[in-house]
Amino acid sequence: MISVPALIFDCDGVLADTEQDGHLRAFNETFQHFGLPVSWSVADYAEMLRIGGGKERLRSLLTPQFIAAADLPADESVQSQAIATWHRNKTEIYTALVDAGVMPARPGIARIAQAASAAGWILACASTSAEPSVRAVLTHAVGPKLAAKFSVFAGDIVSAKKPSPDIYVLALSELGVDADDAIVIEDSENGLRAAVGAGLRTVVTVSTFTANENFSDASLVVSSLGDPIPGEATRVLSDPLRLGAGSIISLVDLSRILAVPRIKHESHIHYNREVAP
């Protein structure tokens, strides 16, 4: 029996460079809307990106000083409700920014997704962001017709966010695909660690906030997937498999990476299908 390969994309920083003009802006507008005593700079947000998940980043604010300044009750259940409310508002703002076209798709995303679909590959997106945000970016990046072919794994469907491998282990299980037959496109060290932890070979397309991170476990590190138009060629930053990729990363390149034996990892996950992102 011939196995069907799968191409799994992260969302933020991979489909589009969403962090500074999308998520950061949406967080700060949410803080202002609710009168919260915080505003993140670009440098602040770069540190926040070490924490996987938007709700988790909001929860990191809840120091005793912040709780007092924001006039929040000490009851943790009420605090959790406040975080959920802030996060819903942030997601609405972010989705509106995506719909407004503030964040263009990164080079090569639509091209390689279309090529994979035409070749019969399984398509998926695995992200710690809220599902409405992920679907909005995906639709903007590849178009509604192609986006409908993607399986989306997002938000709180797993209890442990990246760099835990849970989201990728779940995706493989739900897609019915072995790690030998799947390849991931990521942009961050946390995402790479999650994918490699699930035994997946990974191509990293560095983004604005991740250029200086450690990608030593990646199968290939590039500036982008590239497109065959002036100014959109990829730059190969690390090529440990000696693929010798050209000005664009093609489905042939991904297939060659899949032909390389992977390192197997044991992963144990706990996921929640009932929790809304």
Tell what function each PLM region has.
Residues 2-11, 15-107, 114, 118-119:
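N-terminal helical cap/lid subdomain that shapes the substrate entry/recognition surface
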Residues 22, 26-27, 51-63, 126-138, ...:
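Conserved long hydrophobic alpha-helices within structured protein cores
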Residues 38-40, 69, 123, 145, ...:
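Residue-level detector of short coil/turn "hinge" positions at structural boundaries
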